[in-house]
């Protein structure tokens, strides 16, 4: 997922603070995938710094757009999103935003960006009082918990995945779109 915004008189430091606030309130922005293929939500992540580059002409913008719109994330490492700002010689800035769709679909990304911009422009944003994970735990009844424990035990004793022969190693595959 990639989108960019042209913004006049952008305060990058304020934007960065609002992005970090939203990261702290949103489990999906703290998600990584373990080597076992399970989602893991990090409790603590480093402060996210928004890189800034000089935007001299349309070619710089196009180059950044091409780079970010085709970026492939490492699922085992945080973050799986990227914000950066191109600054012109005037007051115009370009905010480039991309996410891996494993953490957010387009609707969720739009909602998240609306939260960031609302906070940036001083509007009040109501964040959920509990995380999605805690909400799901509250909704789960005792029978579901027993069933979950049963299946966790079953999964521990399942056979390993089959070894598949590939024409190339995944690391050798290039230009995937």
Specify the residue positions occupied by each region the protein language model found:
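Short, charged/polar, Gly/Pro-enriched secondary-structure boundary elements
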Residues: 43-51
């Amino acid at each position: 997922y990639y989108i960019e915004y042209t913004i006049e008189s952008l305060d990058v430091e304020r934007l960065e603070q609002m992005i970090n606030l939203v990261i702290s309130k949103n489990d999906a922005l703290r998600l990584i995938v373990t080597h076992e293929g399970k989602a893991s939500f990090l409790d603590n992540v480093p402060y996210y710094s928004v890189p800034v580059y000089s935007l001299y002409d349309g070619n710089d913008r196009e180059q950044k757009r091409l780079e970010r719109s085709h970026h492939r994330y490492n699922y085992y490492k945080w973050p799986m999103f990227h914000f950066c700002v191109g600054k012109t010689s005037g007051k115009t800035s370009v905010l480039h935003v991309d996410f891996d769709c494993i953490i957010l679909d387009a609707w969720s990304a739009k909602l998240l960006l609306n939260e960031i911009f609302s906070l940036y422009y001083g509007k009040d944003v109501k964040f959920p009082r509990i995380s999605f994970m805690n909400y799901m735990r509250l909704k789960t009844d005792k029978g579901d918990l027993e069933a979950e424990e049963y299946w966790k035990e079953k999964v521990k004793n399942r056979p390993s995945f089959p070894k598949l022969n590939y024409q190339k190693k995944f690391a050798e595959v290039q230009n995937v779109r």
